[in-house]
Amino acid sequence: EAGEECDCGSPENPCCDAATCKLRPGAQCADGLCCDQCRFMKKGTVCRVAKGDWNDDTCTGQSADCPRNGLYG
């Protein structure tokens, strides 16, 4: 929603302040296939395995999202 940096549903989330819906100090992300321990995963980390001859999807190192490259099983 507007003004939110993260989903503030769970007070146990170490990356997101449940009271403000903002990332905690030092956190880059709170969830996503390319988010691990509140940090963006390294560029090239496989975040989704492809099906067949397509390439696996990999993290960009700049976002918690996993960009789609091909077909999946």
Swiss-Prot record:
Q: For the Disintegrin domain, which residue ranges apply?
A: 1-73
Quote the SUPFAM superfamilies the UniProt record gives: Blood coagulation inhibitor (disintegrin) (SSF57552)
Q: Which organism is it from?
A: Sistrurus miliarius barbouri (Dusky pigmy rattlesnake)
- Write out the entry's keywords from A to Z: Cell adhesion impairing toxin, Disulfide bond, Hemostasis impairing toxin, Pharmaceutical, Platelet aggregation inhibiting toxin, Secreted, Toxin
The record, for Pfam families, names: Disintegrin
- Family named by the database record: Belongs to the venom metalloproteinase (M12B) family. P-II subfamily. P-IIa sub-subfamily.
Question: Which tissues is this chain's protein expressed in?
Answer: Expressed by the venom gland.
Per its record, how is this protein called by name?
Disintegrin barbourin
Mind telling me which PANTHER family this protein's record contains? ADAM A DISINTEGRIN AND METALLOPROTEASE DOMAIN, DISINTEGRIN AND METALLOPROTEINASE DOMAIN-CONTAINING PROTEIN 28
Subunit structure, briefly?
Answer: Monomer.
As annotated in the record, motif Cell attachment site runs over 51-53
